[in-house]
Each structure stands twice: as C-alpha cells, then as structure tokens.
C-alpha cells in the first residue's frame, strides 16, 4: 500500500509540473511576440519630417531641412 501511495504522489507531481511548464511556455511565447512588435516600426518616406537618419526609409535625413531625402 505504501508503494502505491508513493507512485500516486509521484505521478501527481509530474502531472502538475507538466501543466505548469505548458502555462509558462504560453506566456513566454506571448512575451516574445510583444517584444517583436516593439521592434517593428514604420519609416518616414522622402519629403517627410525627420530628426535622425534612422527615421527615414532610405536612411538619409537632411538635418538642415529636417526632411527625409
């Protein structure tokens, strides 16, 4: 009877651990998606306002006129 009780408790712990890790994996995937969406941004086309080169689609900002060239 003692052996059966130990096996039952072990099985319960394994099932709980598996369920817990699945829940964490869902959250981990969701966080990864959120991070990727933060990195995705639109660029400013030629003639649009800019402050630095990284804002322009063609990667060149005329700082004198503050427009993408």
Curated annotation (Swiss-Prot):
It is found in: Secreted. Its main location: secreted. It comes from the Eukaryota. Residues 1-17 form the signal peptide. One of its GO terms (cellular component) is extracellular region. GO terms for molecular function: ion channel inhibitor activity; toxin activity. Keywords: Disulfide bond, Knottin, Secreted, Signal, Toxin. Expressed by the venom duct. Disulfide bonds join 43-57, 50-61, 56-68. Residues 18-41 form a propeptide. Belongs to the conotoxin O1 superfamily. This precursor corresponds to allele E1a. Has not been merged with other alleles since they may differ due to geographic variation (see strains in PubMed:19606224). The presence of a 'disulfide through disulfide knot' structurally defines this protein as a knottin. This is Conotoxin Eb6.1. It comes from Conus ebraeus.
